[in-house]
Amino acid sequence: MSDQQQQQPGQDGQPFFNIQRVYLKDLSLEQPNSPHIFLEQEQPSVEVQVDVAASQLAEGVFEVTVIGTVTTKVQEKVAFLVEAKQAGIFDIRNVPAEQMDPLLGIACPTIVYPYLRSNIADTIGRAGFQPIHLAEINFQALYEQRLAAAMEQQGQAGGTGLVMPDGSKATH
């Protein structure tokens, strides 16, 4: 046996990224007009909203949550409303500060989102409706839109820095 201690990942100064867990954090389904809505023959309208949130849980440990809301209406009556939060816990160490926000806003949601899509489609199908398969999302484009909107808002307020979704500050 060797007397050398094994180093934990990320302790050697090298960048380290690990998925600890992906889990369904919250899920709700509302069908306020059932069972009568099943008798409607008109095609439903579908509205989808997706958002991303990130928070630090401990040193080098982050939770990234992808929030999805699907609202389907038939003749202005809500057929169903699904709200879901799919989260992942990520171990991220020795990553330069300027790369953390894109990692939390692009890479992590890209990993978590397929689980959210699956859970939403499954829930809608189990509720008696045709499953809705959410489209793929380009989280880089979404991140860049949020960054541009935040920069514009900051500029209008006369500020000099940018506060990102995780609470950190970035400058332009």
UniProtKB/Swiss-Prot annotation:
Similarity comment: family membership: Belongs to the SecB family.
Main localization, broad class: cytoplasm
GO BP: any one term: protein folding
Gene: secB
UniProt keywords, alphabetically: Chaperone, Cytoplasm, Protein transport, Translocation, Transport
Top-level taxonomic group: Bacteria
Source organism of this protein record: Ralstonia pickettii (strain 12J)
Subcellular location: Cytoplasm
Database matches in InterPro entries: SecB (IPR003708), SecB-like_sf (IPR035958)
Protein name, as recorded: Protein-export protein SecB
Pfam families in alphabetical order: SecB
Alphabetical list of SUPFAM superfamilies matching this protein: SecB-like
Self-association and partners: Homotetramer, a dimer of dimers. One homotetramer interacts with 1 SecA dimer.
HAMAP family in UniProt: SecB
Gene Ontology terms for molecular function: unfolded protein binding
GO cellular component: cytoplasm
